[in-house]
């Protein structure tokens, strides 16, 4: 246990000088001897016994000359069943005022990804109960899913609905990592889980947006380490990360202070490597699976921004939320033409599901092309076939909307869980023209097709 002293503090980056024969290793955790007891993580060795570190907490009250001790190991967090139902910070300390976490077992947050031989793939579908997702971009059990969207199009609400549906229907464990998001949403989420009686199956790790960049940079790894423990015990785990963009952003914040040259759009030059280190660990092994759902903020609605573009490469399914669809009042605002999934293959999901999904996409794409003609010449100039197609497209567009359980307090409408079988049957019926006689508003904000038929009787 060697000790050194602080020689420089710039924002969240702190330089510490140690005796030359006992310089701490990269990623070692250092403890500052101060009232706050701040933890530092070694990032670089500058030579002459000086190491450059990131603070895992506020640097207020720190000053040059304070004593720092090397713990001799990386940051470690509690793992196992004792973490369920608890809220923890980046260092695994409880922040829910419910006493210490009753486990002796701790794992380091920096771990190697499973080797090629240990990994296992799977094609089992994970039903979400959300029509548009199950139809157009189905999720794979043990896969990675990204929810892409700009500010205020509903990423967190979609995420909370997915957690509610999957955590209640799926009986396994879940880990939720709140990375740089609003504290209010973290609080709402905790109460949502408590009210749904699934809190005892969820471990919550928060590093919210008011916290220093060190916390936001590492909190995703803290959550992932807890999920890996459950997976290695033979469980199927759900890992929710909200928001992966803030993980990148925290890296950007400290990158320049660490002396790195910025790359495109000011991002850190190590963007792809940092993302890869995190994403490669989120994988299924022969012991158990990790199914990961990640919200990805898209700066200025630009999907070609380096951060979302780097994330795309790692995902099995992408759910793209569109501002244009949200402006029509259709929620969830998922863009069925932009969202994709590796599972959308007749050999995996079956021919009927595949044909229905592709049929829906064809009709919506054709409607998109005809919109310009309709805007200039009006509906009357279209052929009979195109008129029929436009009517069906408008019904499909409305039928893709759905009331959410987690939004009941805002909408006043009770949430709906729609099984995959009912989803396929409903859209297949609209494509075949079985419901051409129903008005299009009957399809808006309903669950299954039977509900749309009932609603039409009241209109």
Curated annotation (Swiss-Prot):
EC category: translocase
Organism: Pseudomonas syringae pv. tomato (strain ATCC BAA-871 / DC3000)
InterPro entries the record matches: AAA+_ATPase, ATP-synt_VA_C, ATP_synth_F1_bsu, ATPase_a/bsu_AS, ATPase_alpha/beta_chains, ATPase_F1/V1/A1_a/bsu_N, ATPase_F1/V1/A1_a/bsu_N_sf, ATPase_F1/V1/A1_a/bsu_nucl-bd
Entry GO MF terms: ATP binding; ATP hydrolysis activity; proton-transporting ATP synthase activity, rotational mechanism
EC number(s) on file: 7.1.2.2
Keyword set, alphabetical order: ATP synthesis, ATP-binding, Cell inner membrane, Cell membrane, CF(1), Hydrogen ion transport, Ion transport, Membrane, Nucleotide-binding, Translocase, Transport
Transmembrane region(s): none
Short name of any one Pfam family annotated for the protein: ATP-synt_ab_N
Gene this protein is translated from: atpD
One cellular component term from this protein's GO annotations in UniProt: plasma membrane
SUPFAM superfamilies: C-terminal domain of alpha and beta subunits of F1 ATP synthase, N-terminal domain of alpha and beta subunits of F1 ATP synthase, P-loop containing nucleoside triphosphate hydrolases
Catalyzed reactions: ATP + H2O + 4 H(+)(in) = ADP + phosphate + 5 H(+)(out)
Matching Gene3D superfamilies: 2.40.10.170, Bovine Mitochondrial F1-atpase, Atp Synthase Beta Chain, Chain D, domain 3, P-loop containing nucleotide triphosphate hydrolases
Protein name (record): ATP synthase subunit beta
Lipid metabolism is among the record's keywords: no
Function: Produces ATP from ADP in the presence of a proton gradient across the membrane. The catalytic sites are hosted primarily by the beta subunits.
HAMAP family: ATP_synth_beta_bact
NCBIfam families attached to this UniProt entry: atpD
Top-level taxonomic group: Bacteria
Subunit relationships: F-type ATPases have 2 components, CF(1) - the catalytic core - and CF(0) - the membrane proton channel. CF(1) has five subunits: alpha(3), beta(3), gamma(1), delta(1), epsilon(1). CF(0) has three main subunits: a(1), b(2) and c(9-12). The alpha and beta chains form an alternating ring which encloses part of the gamma chain. CF(1) is attached to CF(0) by a central stalk formed by the gamma and epsilon chains, while a peripheral stalk is formed by the delta and b chains.
Topology class, membrane: Peripheral membrane protein
Binding site for ATP: 149-156
């Amino acid at each position: 246990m060697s000790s050194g002293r602080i020689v420089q503090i710039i924002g969240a980056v702190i330089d510490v000088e140690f005796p030359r024969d006992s310089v701490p290793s990269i990623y070692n955790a250092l403890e500052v001897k101060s009232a706050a007891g701040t933890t530092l993580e070694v990032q670089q060795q500058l030579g002459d016994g000086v190491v450059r570190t990131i603070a895992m907490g506020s640097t207020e009250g720190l000053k040059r000359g304070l004593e720092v001790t090397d713990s001799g190991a990386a940051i470690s967090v509690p793992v196992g069943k004792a973490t369920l139902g608890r809220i923890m910070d980046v260092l695994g300390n409880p922040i829910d005022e419910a006493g210490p976490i009753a486990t002796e077992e701790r794992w380091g947050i920096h771990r190697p990804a499973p080797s090629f031989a240990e990994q296992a793939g799977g094609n089992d579908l994970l039903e979400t109960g959300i029509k548009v997702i199950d139809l157009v971009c189905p999720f794979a059990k043990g896969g990675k899913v990204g929810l892409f969207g700009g500010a205020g199009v509903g990423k967190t609400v979609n995420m909370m609905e997915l957690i509610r549906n999957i955590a209640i229907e799926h009986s396994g464990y879940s880990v939720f990592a709140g990375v740089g998001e609003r504290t209010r949403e973290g609080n709402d989420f905790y109460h949502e889980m408590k009210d749904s009686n699934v809190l005892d199956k969820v471990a919550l790790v928060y590093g919210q947006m008011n916290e220093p960049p060190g916390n936001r940079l590492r909190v995703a790894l803290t959550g992932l380490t807890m999920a890996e423990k459950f997976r290695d015990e033979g469980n199927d785990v759900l890992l929710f990360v909200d928001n992966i963009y803030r993980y990148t952003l925290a890296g950007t914040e400290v990158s320049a202070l660490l002396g790195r040259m910025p790359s495109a759009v000011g991002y850190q030059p190590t963007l792809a490597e940092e993302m890869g280190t995190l994403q490669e660990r989120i994988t299924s092994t022969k012991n158990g699976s990790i199914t990961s759902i990640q919200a990805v903020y898209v700066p200025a609605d630009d999907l070609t921004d380096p951060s979302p573009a780097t994330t795309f490469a790692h995902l099995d399914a992408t759910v793209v939320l569109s501002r244009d669809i949200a402006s029509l009042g259709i929620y969830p605002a998922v863009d069925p033409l932009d969202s994709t999934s590796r599972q959308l293959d007749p050999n995996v999901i079956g021919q009927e599901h595949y044909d229905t999904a592709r049929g829906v996409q064809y009709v919506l794409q054709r409607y998109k092309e005809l919109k310009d003609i309709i805007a200039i010449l009006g509906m009357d100039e279209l052929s009979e076939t195109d008129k029929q197609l436009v009517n069906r497209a408008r019904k499909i567009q409305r039928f893709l909307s759905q009331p959410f359980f987690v939004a009941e307090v805002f909408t006043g409408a009770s949430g709906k869980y729609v099984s995959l079988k009912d989803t396929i049957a409903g859209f297949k019926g609209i494509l075949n023209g079985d419901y051409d006689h129903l008005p299009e508003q009957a399809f808006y904000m309903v669950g299954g097709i039977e509900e749309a038929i009932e609603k039409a009787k009241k209109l």
